[in-house]
Amino acid sequence: MKSSLTIFTLLFAASGALAASVGQPAPAFSAIDVNGKAVTLADYKGKTVVLEWVNPGCPYVRKHYDSANMQATQKSAAGKQVVWLAVNSTHPSQYDYLKPGDMNAWMKKQGAAPSATLMDGEGKIGRAYGARTTPQMYVIDAKGTLVYAGGIDDTPSANPADVKAAKNYVNAALGDVLAGKAVAQPVTRPYGCSVKYADS
């Protein structure tokens, strides 16, 4: 646990900006989703929220969608009245940037089930949360406190076959939060492709 906290702190320091910290209020944000609708974190006050950083061009993201792991995790969360916001912070100048309509089409093709998919092309939300990889996951409790930050699971590979034996950290965190417990592993090491910010 101590080493995980150290790793995550170093990741934040490397970002060159202040970023969200577990145990502190989750940074407020607003964005436009793939359907052109304005979405704010405040819209979901009083609800548990999951943030998922996603980029369809990343093989680590495709691992979790090709295996249907991410979709299953999204649907499990929805069944527990948890809000799930997928966030794409890829800058329009990057080669794997998708326009909102294309991003929406990709999510639909995958059978994804987020509450909304947000376009964060300027990277404001990503930088506020210190998101460095895709996928990268955050859980915010009903009080608006960031209670989990890190990876989707404990197996840092791009192989879909590895999902079955992996520990799903998001499911575990949600289980603790919804049971009124402190998250047992509030910080883990995220893995994946770098978030494609303008200066990355």
Kindly give the residue locations of the regions a language model identified.
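Short active-site neighborhood of thiol/selenol oxidoreductases, capturing the structured segment around
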Residues: 42-62, 174
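Positively charged n-region of N-terminal signal peptides that target proteins for export
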Residues: 1-7
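A short beta-strand-turn-helix
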Residues: 29-49
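Sec/Tat signal peptide C-region and signal peptidase I cleavage site
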Residues: 15-19
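Short, internal strand/loop/helix patches
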Residues: 104-141, 146-147
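Thiol-/selenol-based redox modules, centered on thioredoxin-like
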Residues: 139-200
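Loop/turn elements at helix/coil->beta-strand transitions in domains of secreted/extracellular proteins
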Residues: 46-49, 79-84, 112-115, 142-145
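Structural microenvironment flanking redox-active thiols in thiol-disulfide oxidoreductases
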Residues: 62-110, 121-128
